[in-house]
């Protein structure tokens, strides 16, 4: 397996990343366990998940993929062998955090804490915003006109306080 340095960190990630978005919906928990075991056997140490998974997203399966990974970590004690990436879901799912899913402090903090609990870990190696939260033309919307004065969307720079706090505390 080939490995690359992750950004400006000292983490070495496999050039193949294990995607997990179907676990709990299209794939069973035992199948997820089998894939995780096989990934480590072949040196795949970079794994990607998200609070939104499994896919297709539904309120009933929200966070389920993270739960599967967390149970596997608890069972195998292999958390230290994995470079784990997860994502906070942005706008679009009203069942997330009671519809409070914009990228602002309390929502980011609640999402991060939920992921940590489901994943049964005290740190996440790479924490990402799943969707941009900006007022842009998306999914084929016709006739979109950008308004420079539009202030209802958060700027990405405004989102870093809870994330920086988590980085300082070695949670992310």
Regions of interest found by a model, annotated:
Residues 39, 87, 118:
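Conserved catalytic core of Hanks-type protein kinase domains
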Residues 1-83, 122:
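N-terminal binding-site loop/beta-alpha segment at the start of enzyme catalytic domains
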Residues 85, 91-93, 99:
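Surface-exposed, interaction-prone regions with an acidic/low-complexity signature
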Residues 21-23, 52, 87-91, 129-132:
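Active-site beta-loop-alpha junctions enriched in small/polar residues
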Residues 26, 55-57, 94, 134-137:
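Glycine/Thr-rich phosphate-binding loops of Rossmann-like dinucleotide-binding domains
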Residues 12-16, 91-95, 147:
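A short alpha-helix capping/helix-coil boundary motif
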Residues 68-72, 87, 107-114:
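Generic beta-strand or strand-like secondary-structure segments
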């Amino acid at each position: 397996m080939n490995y690359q340095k992750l950004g400006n960190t000292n983490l070495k990630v496999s050039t193949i990343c294990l995607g997990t978005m179907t676990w709990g919906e299209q794939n069973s928990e035992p199948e997820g366990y089998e894939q995780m075991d096989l990934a480590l056997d072949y040196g795949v140490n970079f794994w990607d998940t998200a609070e939104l998974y499994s896919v297709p997203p539904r309120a009933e399966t929200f966070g389920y993929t993270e739960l599967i990974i967390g149970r596997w970590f608890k069972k195998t004690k292999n958390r230290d062998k994995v470079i784990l990436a997860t994502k906070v879901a942005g706008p679009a799912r009203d069942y997330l955090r009671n519809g409070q899913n914009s990228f602002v402090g309390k929502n980011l903090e609640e999402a991060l804490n939920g992921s940590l609990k489901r994943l049964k870990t005290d740190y996440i190696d790479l924490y990402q915003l799943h969707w941009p939260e900006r007022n842009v033309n998306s999914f084929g919307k016709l006739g979109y006109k950008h308004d420079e004065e539009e202030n209802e969307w958060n700027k990405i720079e405004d989102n870093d306080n809870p994330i920086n706090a988590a980085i300082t505390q070695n949670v992310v």
